[in-house]
Amino acid sequence: MIRYKISPALQKNHKSRQFYLVFQEALKMLNWKDNDIRCTINVRLDFGMPAGSGRVIHRRGKHTILLHPSPRKPFPWNTVRHEFFHSVLKSKIRSRLSKYTIPLPIPKSYQTQTFRENLEEYCVRALQIIFLQQKNGVQWGQKQVAHEIQQGFTLIPVFVKFFRQWRKTKRSFSRKTFVDLIYFLN
């Protein structure tokens, strides 16, 4: 069961229900349910980060999503979903995939991360693109793919293709999904 804790400051301006709905969207993309995962998700503000950014801190089944919404832009629900994807993937699939390594082109800021972390980053970005493309249209998806390539995630079109095919299977995301993806990339 996932336990959600939304900070009072965020509850004031943004309904807790909206957070729950965004979390449910992510679970649906993974073909999971709330009771498939045991973890705690805390969401709070952190004004020490650049405006408009977000990140997640992972500690033994407890995940803290830190947000610094930009006052001039809409609330970053896409960032909330992105960080939630990371939280639940780390909680449910603990494998480091250490026997697998293939070269993944990544931006310099990601080069200190493990293969598993970088593979997961690609997965989260591809799932976000598919989700938001369904919502915002094909052109939006194409622009986002181009943006991700420009950022250094040059294999993102391959990941999007894999996850489009995987979503048709209706299978739950699992360690096997990671392994299938690795073979797909080879």
Feature roles, as predicted:
Residues 6-16, 67-71, 109-115:
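Second-shell loop/turn segments in exported
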Residues 91-117:
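Post-HEXXH active-site segment of zinc metalloproteases
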Residues 65-81:
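Short pre-active-site segment immediately N-terminal to the catalytic Zn-binding motif
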Residues 77-95:
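Active-site recognition of the HExxH zinc-binding catalytic motif
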Residues 1-58:
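Auxiliary, metal-adjacent structural segments of Zn-dependent hydrolase domains
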